[in-house]
Amino acid sequence: MEKETKSLAWPATAEFYGWVFIFSSIQLCTMVLLTVRFNSFKVGREYAVFTFAGMSFNCFLLPIKMGLLSGHWSLPRDFCAILLYIDDFSIYFSSWSLVFMAIERINHFCYSTPLLNENSKALAKVCFPIVWIISGVQALQMLNNYKATALQNETPQCFLAFLRSGYDMWLMLVYSVMIPVMLVFIYIYSKNFMLLKDELSTVTTYLCIYLLLGTIAHLPKAGLSEIESDKIFYGLRDIFMALPVLKVYYIPVMAYCMACDDHTVPVRLCSIWLVNLCKKCFSCTRREKESDLEVGIKMLK
């Protein structure tokens, strides 16, 4: 019975991954276009680029996961470990890039232009090696946990790389959400006297939203890992496994919100597109009416 449940559940999860890939690719391309093309993109642009790059790797791994979960592909465990490392590294890399982008945004509020340029250069020299090293070490720890689990399990199927344990989800929640947010909150507290009320509320709002979404994505799988979800509710295990995929949506949105000064660009672009579409529709109907009138005049003549 358990085998039948698994065989029915994996194709549904694979289909969900496919839809997530389609919509997340469209969203990621839209966020990059809005950030680079239609905004000033002056504050933290390097960190925004690194965040989008990390999430693009994570997004384009979704079709591979889809093929593995559906059973169409079969890969050795070592290659699964490589995919798992890239997946985790991209998440941590994007999360820590967001941290330094938030610090850059706070410095933009606190300092004048000469001091801001000096602090930005110093921060860029320090942050990129830190981001690479921390992300690599954190992803390596997750990889070691997977190898230990894979050795104890006799199933040679590659989707074991994507069945995360509750302990792994706790680590991901702490490493990619809790610690980065707490560090930025500490930095805000140290610069509290230099920030205006509106600026402080803007940054703290973004951090709280990121903390909430990250907790929603990782906490159910981490907290309910010991429960046999197949016996409680059919498909609950797949929901828990699919929730962490939400990061491909909220991390690019947070990068866009922190990197761009004008957040009304999407609204204005949609309004312009709708106005142009209405103009074209009205012009076409007007031409059709004029052509019918001309035909009627010719018939009368």
Swiss-Prot record:
TM ranges: 16-36, 49-69, 83-103, 123-143, 169-189, 200-220, 239-259
Compartments where found: Host cell membrane
Record keywords, A-Z: G-protein coupled receptor, Host cell membrane, Host membrane, Membrane, Receptor, Transducer, Transmembrane, Transmembrane helix
An annotated Gene Ontology molecular function: G protein-coupled receptor activity
Pfam families (UniProt xref): 7tm_1
Positions on the Cytoplasmic side per record topology: 37-48, 104-122, 190-199, 260-301
Keyword Transmembrane belongs to the record: yes
Example of a GO cellular component annotation carried by this entry: host cell plasma membrane
Record membrane topology: Multi-pass membrane protein
Extracellular face residues: 1-15, 70-82, 144-168, 221-238
Family, similarity comment: Belongs to the G-protein coupled receptor 1 family.
Protein name, entry field: G-protein coupled receptor homolog U51
